[in-house]
């Protein structure tokens, strides 16, 4: 291939990716101008580049992404992040538990009341996205990034205990590390009476039902499975044991917001949401998926 031909092909590819990113940004922000993360934009771009995806949405599976992440990053850098409406900046670290313990909130009596629910996110950027879209206000549920919030500050623990029946919701990837997070949260809470830890997902069967793109990382060690939830099915455990993963960021932003609101606020009339047909949460905190 001549140098001029190679240059022309590269230019066309760059132009195609630029158009795909623009279309993906419009879709990610719909409805109502949602804010979204760079990784969410990446997965939305993959959907734009997969025109057959809508035809296969009822066929369970975890296909590979249509676009390599480095190619997307180069295209986004060439376009300029500032040209993408709705794209959030990289999420800064939240206040650490020590910071929370040292400082009182602007409302002096905030922690004097019971806190019936709290949402912990494995991914800092997902926590920032939910906050940017005011999920914490609509659900009356604080949203924190687990890496920064654990162990929880004593003030938060006291507020959860005071609520008498509080739930700490955990939103995590379908990954070897993600499925262990609810157990880590339970251990970090310690013996707090009346506080329940519930997983909102993802687990591999959610990822397959939603046809989320999946990746592959290093396979976990042989002992890793001992810490995985008993509710995992054998084929899910085998999927994770191969180092496979699907990220919460792969869920379309609007669907993610609807689902988190629905599950953190409690029962609501049926809506078109990511887990609209679920019967509820298992006692252990795992979501059940309708049998195909």
Regions found by a protein language model. Give the residues of each.
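Nucleic-acid enzyme cleavage-core boundary/entry regions
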Residues: 1-166, 176-292
